[in-house]
Amino acid sequence: SDRYSLIEGANDITCDFVLKKPSLWWCNGYGRQDIHEFTVDVQTESSSASYIQKAGVRTIDVIRQDDAWGKSMSLRLNGYDVFCKGANWIPVDNFPTRRSRSDYAELTGAAAEAGMNMLRVWGGGLYEHEDFYDACDSLGIMVWQDMAFACGMFPSDEAYLQSVTAEVRDNVRRLRNHPSLALWCGNNENEISYFEWGWNRTLTQEQREHYEAGLHRLFYEIIPEAIAKEDDTRYYHPSSPSTGHSGVPYSMGDAHMWSVWKGGWVEEYLKPHNIARFMSEYGFISYPDMFTLKKFVPEWDMRPDSPTMLAHHRAYDDTTRDPEYSNKTICRYLDRYAWVPEDFEEFV
């Protein structure tokens, strides 16, 4: 151990040391999740204090290389290429403080038992509680961390940018020592929503130029610069998805593929133009379990097309706005790949 003398006020001390043959941190399915403890003791003539920082020893590289298909996007852990298997993580409760450490352990544990080794903290949610990252550390679940920006058009005035800088630096400083944290991402769908969903067509040319300059400054300058001041060891991904808009094909990076849900058939995934290098988001609608439904649905409304169920679903087709679109899609897949349910409980 090393000793240092402190002066009154803030002290900034850098301590270099070498770990000889350290045990490494690996993701789920690739090895053990060894965690090391580093202790700092502060002593005065009359009192003392200790601080313990847990950390894992590992390297994570995001590989972006030009190749015969386009440009790769994959993760390399401790020199070994990893096939990422996982899901998107949204807030565990509409009232997050209602949840405990055991709730995070249960949910992340279920992901690990399912063979997952990565969770993407979705940008429309929040910077998660320490219990989530601790659980991921111990289970070997790598974390893709979005900044808290999603599906919207954000301002770029100086006061707002100063607030963003403070928010980003605070959260990066809080989370950077977790070995599970694999990469930072600027936002969820802010670029594709603007360039591909028609939002830019609602603006004048002058407004577009102003907003696009602000978009670039926020996610390509302000946020990565704020991250680098607290953590210059991790890859920064400006926006997810990085493909499917602005003329960038799926062969160049990560994609959000909703063709199975929106397009209607699993075969959509297999079309060459839909095969992405990293599938960072996809999904399918689902019902809550019966335990949850019985809390708010009256017995006489326990059917897919009831007013109560349709009001809670609100999953419409983008074109027809058919309120029963979700049920029709579910039934189509059940008929094709499973069986026709005999009652509502079996349907759920």
Predicted regions and their residues:
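Secreted/periplasmic carbohydrate-active enzymes, especially glycoside hydrolases
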Residues: 1-119, 138, 258
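Short N-terminal secondary-structure initiator segments
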Residues: 17-24, 36, 83-88, 95, ...
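Generic recognition of flexible, low-complexity loop/linker segments
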Residues: 24-26, 108, 170-172, 265-266
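Active-site oxyanion-binding pockets that recognize sulfate/phosphate
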Residues: 26, 154, 209, 213, ...
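Generic, ordered loop/turn and secondary-structure boundary motif
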Residues: 26-27, 61, 148-150, 155, ...
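Residue-level preference for short coil/turn positions at secondary-structure junctions
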Residues: 32, 177, 232, 273-274
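Active-site mouth of glycoside hydrolases
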Residues: 69-235, 240-242, 246-247
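Substrate-binding clefts and catalytic carboxylate motifs of secreted carbohydrate-active enzymes
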Residues: 184, 191, 218, 225-228, ...
